[in-house]
């Protein structure tokens, strides 16, 4: 009995122990269940907090980004404004430069126009002054020389008569049968100088002889050219006289009748001389004859002395 009781007691004790253990387990489970719910709640809360924190962080990041963007855009806007201002200033400067250039161009044009006007005015004034001075020359200004006395007039008549008479005798009595001439119209003009104004530089032996020879040479060249080129006679006449004057200038033998000597050679219809024969007869021979007559006749006069110079 005792063993059976002991076994029953042990079974009961075991049952009690198991019950206690079960109760304890239930208690533990009951305790752990709330803990799990709390943990889940806490986890949820933590997750929510994390989400909130993330959201806050995101918001902060967004805010910071927006602030950064604003900070970035603000300098960019300011830079753009500065660039725009600089561009405007540059445009204004360019406009000012263009205006200045236009003003300078206008000023230059005005200056050029003024210069042209002034030049025209100066040209007109110079032309006016030139013609004023030109027509003033027509007035002369010097007194005319006094008339020669009767003695001088008498000797001029006598010497010129003798000089032309000698040439006429040679022309009509000596050379006419040989179809040559000895008397030219230009010798009459030479007679006026060497017999009427023997003191004139144009009447001296160099001028008388060399002037006629140079002019005859020019006239002969022009006449030969006229024959072979069929040039205009009018031009040939003008060239003969003008070139004869140039030749006399170069040889210091200006003698006004020399121009007539050159002209006669070109205008003569009947050419009684061939080639350059005209230079020797009648020009050189006639001028030397007149020189000899002047030397003889002029020096008979009391107040005359001929020549003043020879060469």
Swiss-Prot record:
It comes from the Eukaryota. The keyword Hydrolase does not apply. Its main location: membrane. Keywords: Coiled coil, Glycoprotein, Membrane, Transmembrane, Transmembrane helix. The chain crosses the membrane at residues 150-170, 181-201, 208-228, 235-255, 276-296. InterPro entries: HPP. Residues 9-18 have a biased composition (Polar residues). It is found in: Membrane. It is a multi-pass membrane protein. One of its GO terms (cellular component) is membrane. Pfam families: TM_HPP. Residues 95-124 form a coiled coil. Residues 37-67, 76-111 have a biased composition (Low complexity). Residues 1-113 are annotated as: Disordered. Glycans are attached at residues 8, 35, 38, 62, 76. This is Transmembrane protein DDB_G0273707/DDB_G0273361. It comes from Dictyostelium discoideum (Social amoeba).
């Amino acid at each position: 009995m005792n063993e059976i009781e002991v076994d029953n007691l042990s079974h009961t004790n075991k049952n009690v122990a198991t019950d206690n253990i079960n109760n304890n387990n239930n208690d533990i489970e009951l305790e752990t269940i709330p803990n799990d719910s709390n943990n889940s709640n806490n986890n949820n809360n933590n997750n929510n907090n994390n989400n909130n924190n993330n959201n806050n962080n995101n918001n902060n990041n967004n805010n910071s980004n927006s602030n950064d963007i604003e900070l970035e855009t603000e300098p960019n806007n300011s830079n753009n404004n500065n660039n725009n201002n600089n561009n405007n200033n540059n445009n204004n400067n360019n406009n000012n430069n263009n205006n200045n250039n236009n003003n300078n161009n206008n000023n230059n044009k005005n200056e050029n126009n003024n210069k042209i006007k002034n030049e025209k005015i100066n040209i007109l004034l110079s032309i006016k002054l030139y013609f004023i001075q030109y027509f003033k020359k027509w007035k002369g200004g010097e007194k005319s020389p006094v008339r020669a006395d009767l003695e001088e007039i008498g000797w001029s008549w006598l010497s010129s008569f003798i000089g032309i008479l000698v040439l006429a005798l040679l022309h009509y009595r000596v050379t006419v049968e040989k179809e040559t001439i000895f008397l030219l119209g230009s010798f009459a003009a030479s007679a006026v100088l060497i017999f009427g104004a023997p003191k004139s530089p144009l009447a001296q032996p160099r001028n008388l002889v060399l002037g006629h020879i140079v002019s005859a040479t020019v006239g002969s060249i022009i006449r030969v050219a006229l024959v072979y080129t069929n040039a205009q006679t009018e031009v040939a006449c003008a060239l003969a006289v003008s070139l004869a004057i140039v030749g006399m200038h170069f040889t210091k033998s200006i003698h006004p009748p020399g121009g007539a000597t050159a002209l006669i050679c070109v205008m003569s219809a009947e050419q009684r001389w061939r080639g350059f024969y005209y230079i020797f007869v009648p020009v050189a021979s006639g001028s030397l004859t007149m020189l000899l007559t002047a030397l003889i006749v002029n020096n008979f006069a009391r107040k005359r002395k001929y020549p003043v110079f020879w060469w």
